[in-house]
Amino acid sequence: MGFPKVERLLINYKTLDEFKKFKGCGAQELSMLEELQANIIENDSESPFYGIYYGGSLIARMSLYMKRNGGEPFEITGTYLELYKLEVLPNFQKQGFGEMLVNYAKGLQFPIKTIARIHSAGFWDKLNFQPVSVPDGDFYVWHPETNLNTVTNEESA
């Protein structure tokens, strides 16, 4: 068995069965089951769901949506990602799987907006997300860093 990796989840009945394992683990606000059922198309690879399989079973998941700021009162301008419903099964928590999912999203090099759920503020702080407060509620934002050490045409490597 190789090292687990983040992959886009297919929208199909197998994924639906895997999502049922998460139903009792978290709060209702983390449930993706109804969202998946509403969008089920056999083997649709354009799903917003991403996860990590370990030993053939889904152990961690999140949903990731591409958005564009249309004047909302927060510090992201242009295209960004909304990361929702990050959840790791209890037996696999505190082993880096949640961080793997977030790092996958960071690797897309867009700003990320998320809402800290269920006492997870420390997790987002550890991953360099910044808290933002607006009249509609609080959330966390991460911005990709610009590489200040990039070699230009005029410099030598």
UniProtKB/Swiss-Prot annotation:
Keywords: Acyltransferase, Transferase. InterPro entries: Acyl_CoA_acyltransferase (IPR016181), GNAT_dom (IPR000182), YlbP (IPR017274). Its EC number is 2.3.1.-. CDD domains: NAT_SF (cd04301). Residues 9-146 form the N-acetyltransferase domain. One of its GO terms (molecular function) is acyltransferase activity, transferring groups other than amino-acyl groups. This is Uncharacterized N-acetyltransferase BCE33L3680. It comes from Bacillus cereus (strain ZK / E33L).
